[in-house]
From Swiss-Prot:
Tissue expression notes: Ubiquitously expressed. Strong expression in the spleen.
Keyword Signal part of the UniProt annotation: no
Short motif Nuclear localization signal, span: 296-301
GO molecular function: chromatin binding; DNA binding; histone binding; histone H3K9ac reader activity; lysine-acetylated histone binding; modification-dependent protein binding
Subcellular location: Nucleus; Chromosome
Location of Phosphoserine modifications: 289, 295, 413, 420, 484
Covalent cross-link Glycyl lysine isopeptide (Lys-Gly) (interchain with G-Cter in SUMO2), where: 340
Gene that specifies this protein: Mllt3
Biological process, per Gene Ontology: anterior/posterior pattern specification; gene expression; hematopoietic stem cell differentiation; negative regulation of canonical Wnt signaling pathway; positive regulation of DNA-templated transcription; positive regulation of Wnt signaling pathway, planar cell polarity pathway; regulation of chromatin organization; regulation of stem cell division
Natural source organism: Mus musculus (Mouse)
Protein's name in the database: Protein AF-9
């Protein structure tokens, strides 16, 4: 392993890709070319026996072998994928080949053409004399230590000339690695070989993170090729002017979930005898229909991680609620009470949730519906489904008439109307949705959520912060929504007709008020556990909803006892 016996050679792996002016009949939208070469056009053929490109299986003859330079493959497609490249050495002893998993990513239309260059440094320790001579002929650097730091070279931003990307080597990687704003990017890594057949990769694939963001999720359909692999590899031009036309589906460009990642930083140890960095077959990015699902999962995952981080830095717990007055008996104060509660809620919203400006009025279902559609389109995260599920689960107040008129009409309805509405309620017990303007009592809901969910889950009430993930077992970013409209089970109807008088309603209002001020996470966890035992709850992807009025008195008493303990602690 002495440095005096080490020879270092460099390989450049890269690809160029640009959007075609017109898609082909098969729907191909990009022309691309991938290559392996020596730096500054040094002749790596001296020590390279052949280069094998393992294209995706959807291509005809996916295994492309290039025995003579230029070692390149030109194709058309509309998909990015991980392309395993095997470089075989003219070496009688191990190592006889090295494998790289190359990320052949494509840019979307409107972005600059891709011109990516990846520099690989191969250090052979104690090579045989014959192989050493071959390495030196190919521009190998003798007497180099295996710990030589990797340097990176930058390719030129031109993508029309096949030799353009080797012309510049002085640009910094940091500027060239941002593939979203520049059409060229570069990276470097170092590989060392020794007699014990170990291969050490020190990967510094700087643009891989950025480039993955621009990968397109699509599938490479089959394409007939009458040329031999040798002919296609020798073809000098990189952009084929194919004239077939077909409009490619718009959904073809979805952000994918990267199936196979390039080697990560700092020394993945691999045995050269296998010659494989990764046994996986090249993973194809899924077609448009599946890519939506995968990209949604990816966004959910990243959003969940972001929410998890925000939980740890969020305040212990802040609860707000759009609780309208439950009592109807005292009609003279209802209007004032409503205005007061709404103003209090909006004050709480401003003081407790300063970052969120777009919380909708709880009575404005039109805004609410717009909001849910907006959040679905703009925020494809786990929170995005909560607005639609909440708005469908929470009875809307304005689907029949204007919000204030319908509410005031109900508030001033007589007791007979209330009783007849209760009878209707009995028929609607099994339904989770029903207009709130029945019986004059309007729904009150407590939504517990972390701050990042506020815009999309604001369906019909202001939001509040959720405690960290341990609060809810089902999901680490779920919303706990406590609803108490006058939807009641039949047993609760009997209670209402008999025992459940104004005093009980007062208790529920008080319970709601105390839930608003509750901040102890362990108490909230107890509440969730209790509601789970009753079975009277509804779980969507992002919410945990339950109805206070559907709970029996025993459960309500337990809730009150939890609040008592929180008050004394």
């Amino acid at each position: 392993m002495a440095s005096s016996c080490a020879v270092q050679v460099k390989l450049e792996l890269g690809h160029r890709a640009q959007v075609r002016k017109k898609p082909t009949v098969e729907g191909f939208t990009h022309d691309w070319m991938v290559f392996v070469r020596g730096p500054e056009h040094s002749n790596i053929q001296h020590f390279v026996e052949k280069v094998v490109f393992h294209l995706h299986e959807s291509f005809p003859r996916p295994k492309r072998v290039c025995k003579d330079p230029p070692y390149k493959v030109e194709e058309s497609g509309y998909a990015g994928f991980i392309l395993p490249i095997e470089v075989y050495f003219k070496n009688k002893e191990e190592p006889k080949k090295v494998r790289f998993d190359y990320d052949l990513f494509l840019h979307l239309e409107g972005h600059p053409p891709v011109n990516h260059l990846r520099c690989e440094k191969l250090t052979f320790n104690n090579p045989t004399e014959d192989f050493r001579r071959k390495l030196l002929k190919a521009g190998g650097d003798p007497n180099r230590s295996i710990h030589t730091s990797s340097s990176s070279s930058s390719s030129s931003s031109s993508s029309s000339s096949s030799s353009s990307s080797s012309s510049s080597s002085s640009s910094s990687s940091s500027s060239s690695s941002s593939s979203s704003s520049s059409s060229s990017s570069s990276s470097s890594s170092s590989t060392s070989f020794s007699k014990p057949h170990k291969l050490m990769k020190e990967h510094k694939e700087k643009p891989s993170k950025d480039s993955r963001e621009h990968k397109s999720a699509f599938k490479e359909p089959s394409r007939d090729h009458n040329k031999s692999s040798k002919d296609s590899s020798k073809k000098p031009k990189e952009n084929k002017p194919l004239k077939e036309e077909k409009i490619v589906p718009k959904m073809a460009f979805k952000e994918p979930k990267p199936m196979s990642k390039e080697p990560k930083a700092d020394s993945n140890l691999l045995t050269v005898t296998s010659g494989q960095q990764d046994k996986k077959a090249p993973s194809k990015r899924p077609p448009a229909s599946d890519s939506e699902e995968l990209s949604a999962k990816k966004r959910k995952k990243s959003s969940s991680e972001a929410l998890f981080k925000s939980f740890s830095s969020a305040p212990p717990l802040i609860l707000t609620c759009s609780a309208d007055k439950k009592q109807i008996k005292d009609k003279s104060h209802v209007k004032m009470g409503k205005v007061k509660i709404e103003s209090e809620t909006s004050e709480k919203k401003k003081s407790m949730l300063p970052p969120f400006d777009d919380i909708v009025d709880p009575n404005d279902s039109d805004v609410e519906e717009n909001m849910s559609s907006k959040s679905d389109s703009e925020q494809p995260s786990p929170a995005s489904s909560s607005s639609s599920s909440s708005s469908s689960f929470t009875p809307s107040q304005t689907r029949q008439q204007g919000p204030l008129r319908s509410i005031m009409k109900d508030l001033h309805s007589d007791d007979n109307e209330e009783e007849s509405d209760e009878a209707e309620d009995n028929d609607n017990d099994s339904e989770m949705e029903r207009p709130v303007n029945r019986g004059g009592s309007r729904s009150r809901r407590v939504s517990l959520s972390d701050g990042s969910d506020s815009e999309s889950s604001s369906a019909s009430s202001p939001l509040h912060h959720e405690p960290p993930p341990p609060l809810l077992k089902t999901n680490n970013n779920q919303i706990l929504e406590v609803k108490s409209p006058i939807k009641q089970s039949k047993s609760d109807k009997q209670i209402k007709n008999g025992e459940c008088d104004k005093a009980y309603l007062d208790e529920l209002v008080e319970l709601h008020r105390r839930l608003m001020t509750l901040r102890e996470r362990h108490i909230l966890q107890q509440i969730v556990n209790l509601i789970e035992e009753t079975g009277h709850f509804h779980i969507t992807n992002t919410t945990f909803d339950f109805d206070l009025c559907s709970l029996d008195k025993t459960t309500v008493r337990k809730l009150q006892s939890y609040l008592e303990t929180s008050g004394t602690s």
